[in-house]
Curated annotation (Swiss-Prot):
GO CC terms of this entry: cytoplasm
Record-given protein name: Cytochrome P450(BM-1)
Enzyme Commission code: 1.14.14.-
Cofactor entry: heme
Domain of life: Bacteria
Function: Cytochromes P450 are a group of heme-thiolate monooxygenases. They oxidize a variety of structurally unrelated compounds, including steroids, fatty acids, and xenobiotics.
Family recorded in the similarity comment: Belongs to the cytochrome P450 family.
């Protein structure tokens, strides 16, 4: 299906990159004054409160993932038709979605995560060890960018030498559509998609004869009701997993350290002295400092579930990052508090049938890299002359850090 891309950046109309990076004032405004908002220019309904967002994401009888318009794409917006449930996974509703999702979930079982943990810890330890003591580093280049790429290359079972090529493909495949560069971006995505396919397809074929402990081997062996993946479907499946395995995690790690430096400077010291709190810190960072996250749904039948008259075919955008600031769910939501008991109820990874498959891996990676950093460095300090605005760039998840300097002390 060739979908129309909704120019979602036209809805908030941010005045700067920094404002888009952390639009806390806009969240407040929409939550308090326009919780259900119709945006005429994009012809979309927008919801921001926790219960509304949860309803739109989970109630597939009324809000469908399949529609002619969308806010986000994985890969390219090609006109080539595909009947593969994996290729179309993000557009499927239950029950069609369930079988494809179950096959894909074979890559993220609790057993797999437990088996992967030592490998991920070793990658984290190697990166942290390479950082010189009492030095100023760029956390993006030195840690948050290479770490997830190294991990996913290892978990896919591909040569480590290709890890940076993975990151390049991810940057292109998940870049946002720009109304002024639609055709150019489309061509870039199609080229990157073709390169990725040509690279990974032979690896999948080879692994069918040489199974090992990696995600591709798990996908080869996955079976639900007698159905298995084709080689082509496995390549497409790995492309979906790249979003959470590299793109999302890389930005989340950088944002976590930004928060330690600029939101609450006492937090790093607290975590250093109480390292068992690392999982709580990860959840609060996912709630408070994640990028703008949203999902679109198409109304399947007329309803008034959101307190307004919705017509079949209407598009509703659920703003998860805004609902994470809803004070009916999170006390004092506009402040960092790793001890808030409801933090894990955030909807950063979605809700319902399309809850992010890679969420457990993203959480595990963030926890491991934070624990490794806390073990190695006694404290961190911000770079005195750092300016945020010049060091942000547009990404699939909003504005992302390209440079974050800090001084580290062992």
């Amino acid at each position: 299906m060739n979908k129309e891309v909704i120019p979602v950046t036209e809805i908030p109309k941010f005045q700067s990159r920094a404002e888009e990076f952390f639009p806390i004032q806009w969240y407040k405004e929409m939550l308090n004054n326009s919780p259900v908002y119709f945006h005429e220019e994009t012809n979309t309904w927008n919801v921001f409160q926790y219960e509304h967002v949860k309803q739109v994401l989970s109630n597939y009888d009324f809000f469908s993932s399949d529609g002619q318009r969308t806010t986000i794409f994985v890969g390219d917006n090609s006109k080539k038709k595909s009947t593969s449930p994996i290729t179309n996974l993000t557009n499927l509703d239950p029950p069609d979605h369930r079988k494809a999702r179950s096959l894909l979930a074979a890559a993220f079982t609790p057993r797999s995560l437990k088996n992967w943990e030592p490998r991920i810890k070793q990658i984290a330890a190697d990166l942290v060890e390479a950082i010189q003591k009492n030095s100023t580093i760029n956390i993006v280049d030195d840690l948050s960018s290479p770490f997830p790429s190294l991990v996913i290359a290892d978990l896919f079972g591909v040569p480590v030498k290709d890890r940076y090529q993975f990151k390049k493909w991810v940057d292109i495949l998940f870049q946002p559509y720009d109304q002024e560069r639609l055709e150019e971006i489309e061509q870039e995505k199609q080229r990157a998609g073709a390169e990725y396919f040509q690279y990974l397809y032979p690896i999948v074929i080879e692994k069918r004869s040489n199974l090992s402990d990696d995600i591709i081997s798990d996908l080869i062996q996955a079976e639900v009701d007698g159905e298995t993946f084709t080689d082509e479907e496995i390549v497409h499946a790995t492309m979906l997993l790249l979003g959470a395995g590299v793109e999302t995690t890389s930005h989340a790690i950088a944002n976590m350290f930004y928060s330690f430096l600029y939101d609450d400077k006492s937090l790093y010291s607290e975590l250093r002295n109480n390292r068992e709190l690392a999982p709580k810190a990860v959840e609060e960072m996912l709630r408070y400092r994640f990028h703008i996250s949203r999902r679109d749904r198409t109304v399947k039948q007329d309803n008034e579930l959101l307190g307004v008259k919705l017509k079949k075919g209407d598009v509703v955008i659920a703003w998860m990052s805004a609902c994470n600031m809803d004070e009916t769910m999170f006390e004092n939501p506009f402040s960092v508090d790793i001890h808030r008991p409801t933090n894990k109820k955030h909807l950063t990874f979605g809700n319902g049938p399309h809850f992010c498959l890679g969420a457990p891996l993203a959480r595990l990676e963030m926890k491991i890299i934070l624990e490794a950093f806390l073990e190695a460095f006694s404290h961190i300090e911000p770079f005195e002359d750092f300016e945020l605005e010049p060091h942000l760039t547009a990404s699939a998840t909003g504005q992302s850090l390209t440079y974050l300097p800090m001084t580290v002390y062992r």
